[in-house]
UniProtKB/Swiss-Prot annotation:
Family: Belongs to the GPI family.
Record has Transcription as a keyword: no
GO CC terms, sorted: cytosol
GO molecular function, one term: glucose-6-phosphate isomerase activity
Active site positions: 360 (proton donor), 391, 519
GO terms (BP aspect): gluconeogenesis; glucose 6-phosphate metabolic process; glycolytic process
Pfam family, one: PGI
Cell compartments where the protein resides: Cytoplasm
Keyword terms: Cytoplasm, Gluconeogenesis, Glycolysis, Isomerase
Pathway of action: Carbohydrate biosynthesis; gluconeogenesis; Carbohydrate degradation; glycolysis; D-glyceraldehyde 3-phosphate and glycerone phosphate from D-glucose: step 2/4
Protein name in the entry: Glucose-6-phosphate isomerase
CDD domains from the UniProt entry: SIS_PGI_1, SIS_PGI_2
Function: Catalyzes the reversible isomerization of glucose-6-phosphate to fructose-6-phosphate.
């Protein structure tokens, strides 16, 4: 249990004090005992909504603890905060901005915010027009050839979200007039770009410069490199930049200054946080892959969760439950690391996406009022595709000394839809899907129940190094199938989970000041490494020593 809870005043009616009392009474209860005490536990601790099923029966909670967690949420005025989120309030207090990513998935006919909805759909329609043109083979490069490769240049929210979704929904790739491939480049060292450019033809390649500020050095350095690559092959003509670059940013003037024509500029707004931006024109690579209908289904799934989040009681509200269970594990059971374990290879990049969403949002130590936080905030979030993880770090989960909470996720159905091109192999592939599902269930069962999950005869003479303690809590999210709609739902669940936890911790989840200063210090060091400046006197001894090695002034 977080020691900071001891700092709270001893008001016996305080939800925190009541929960602390429950910890003292229930901390030694094993998950297997919770199931023994409550035969209907699976039914009582699970929620079905639309295409999602959420099972949290393997969490170390009781009915009484859940009631107290809900009371804590109410005490923190969660309902009022949800209402503020879904308004035009500037709840991003440190930057004096709204946080209206939810507006990006409003249906076009939504009447509550007509002007806002119109703004959003105007930009989406401009994106859809470009998508249709590229898909039809009508968008041509400087030499008149049809574009067949599109490279998204971005970093952080301009890369992680679009990359994750594009990979996850590759089965839903639409047919185009000519084959179209979408690629992603993010690293500032040029390694990804170097490998990729060898595979591409300048005449048929289009680049998306995706940067909210249009000032991110990682992105602009890659953009400048590909510009030189294009101009070397096609000549330094205005039509090269005009035909081979599309920009996505809040800064139209910066895109124009760089050379991107207005027709190729897609806009978003300051109230769209980078890690919440895949629903906007930052999602251009997604729409290029799964088509306009697919992209609209992605938005519709997220909007369905927005409605669920706003209109469902906390006791049956999936993102609220996910958040409160995380609070329970982190702040009361002292479980400060959380693993994300999808049992579907298409969700390969989901854990990396969640790392930014959760840790950049809630990795804070200062409250909204400027005071230090009273509770530990975001746990370490990590993970991997489940079957691969079983051969990497499950040893630690099962028999290590660290307490870890886990989210398992899997689709119920796979390899049975008309759009799959490998129907002739469906029977064997369905068996492989069942193999993945059986492993997903087996691992969550063993983590929860430990030796109880083993055969009694086997356990009788089992040496201690082969035994399992169990009691590692987990939730399981099942999707009817992995499609644009259900993936939109899944992502929005985690967005709102993050928001709920920020309310409990009283922090601002929509800024990222911890990211900014490192970039500024890098800007100060770059002239030294480039030989333009040589004054190292203001630097610490370690940084001075490393710079001298990098410049070849001393041996490493």
């Amino acid at each position: 249990m977080s020691k900071s809870i001891e700092q709270f005043p001893k008001d016996l009616s305080s939800p925190l004090i009541q929960i602390k009392s429950s910890v003292e009474k229930n901390s030694k209860l094993h998950i297997k005992e919770l199931f023994a005490l409550e035969p209907e536990r699976f039914h009582n601790y699970s929620v079905k909504f639309d295409q999602l099923f959420f099972d949290y029966s393997k969490q170390r909670v009781t009915k009484n603890i859940l009631e107290q967690l809900v009371a804590l949420a109410k005490n923190k005025q969660l309902t009022q905060w949800i209402n503020r989120l879904f308004s035009q309030d500037k709840i991003n207090c440190t930057e004096q901005r709204e946080a209206m990513h939810w507006a990006l998935r409003l249906p076009s006919e939504y009447s509550k915010f007509p002007e806002l909805t119109k703004q959003v759909h105007t930009q989406l329609q401009r994106m859809y027009t470009l998508v249709e043109k590229i898909h039809a083979g009508q968008y041509r490069g400087a030499t008149g050839e049809v574009i067949q490769d599109v490279v998204n240049i971005g970093v952080g929210g301009s890369d992680l979200g679009p990359h994750m979704v594009t990979h996850a929904l590759a089965d839903f790739k639409v047919k185009t007039a000519k084959p179209l491939n979408v690629h992603f480049v993010s690293t500032m060292d040029g390694s990804q770009l170097s490998d990729l450019l060898h595979q591409l033809r300048p005449e048929t390649t289009l680049f998306i410069i995706s940067s909210k500020s249009f000032g991110t050095i990682d992105t602009l350095s890659n953009a400048q490199t590909v510009r030189q690559w294009l101009e070397k092959a096609l000549g330094k003509h205005d039509r090269v930049v005009k035909s081979h670059f599309i920009g996505v940013s809040t800064k139209a003037e910066k895109m124009t200054e760089w050379g991107i024509i207005p027709d190729n500029q897609l806009l978003l707004w300051e109230w769209v946080g980078g890690r919440y931006s895949l629903w906007s024109c930052i999602g251009f690579p997604i729409a290029l892959t799964i088509g306009i209908d697919g992209f609209q289904q992605l938005l519709a799934g997220a909007h369905a969760v927005d409605e669920h989040f706003q209109n469902t009681s906390f006791e049956r509200n999936i993102p609220v439950l996910m958040a409160l269970l995380g609070i329970w594990n982190n702040n009361f059971l002292n479980i400060q690391t959380h693993a994300v374990l999808p049992y579907d290879g298409r969700l390969k990049y989901f854990a990396a996406y969640l790392q930014q969403l959760e840790m950049e949002s809630n990795g804070k130590s200062v409250q909204r009022d400027g005071q230090k936080v009273e509770l530990d905030t975001c746990p370490i979030v990590w993970g991997e595709v489940g079957p691969n993880a079983q051969h990497a770090f499950y040893q630690l989960l099962h028999q290590g000394t660290q307490a870890v909470s886990c989210d398992f996720m899997a689709p119920i159905q796979r390899y049975n839809a008309d759009h799959f091109t490998y129907v002739e192999n469906a029977e064997a592939l369905i068996e492989q899907h069942h193999l993945a599902l059986s492993n997903c269930l087996a691992q969550s069962r063993l983590l929860a129940f430990g030796n109880e999950a083993l055969d009694a005869a086997e356990l009788k003479n089992l040496p201690i190094y082969k035994q399992y303690e169990g009691n590692q809590p987990s939730s399981t999210l099942l999707l009817k199938e992995l499609n644009p709609y259900s993936l939109g739902m899944l992502i929005a669940l985690y967005e709102h989970k993050v928001f709920v936890q920020s309310v409990i911790w009283n922090i601002n989840p929509f800024d990222q000041w911890g990211v900014e200063k490192g970039k500024q210090i890098a800007d100060q060091l770059l002239p030294i490494l480039n030989g333009v400046q040589n004054d190292l006197s203001t630097l610490d001894a370690s940084t001075r020593g490393l710079i001298k090695i990098l410049l070849g002034k001393v041996d490493g």
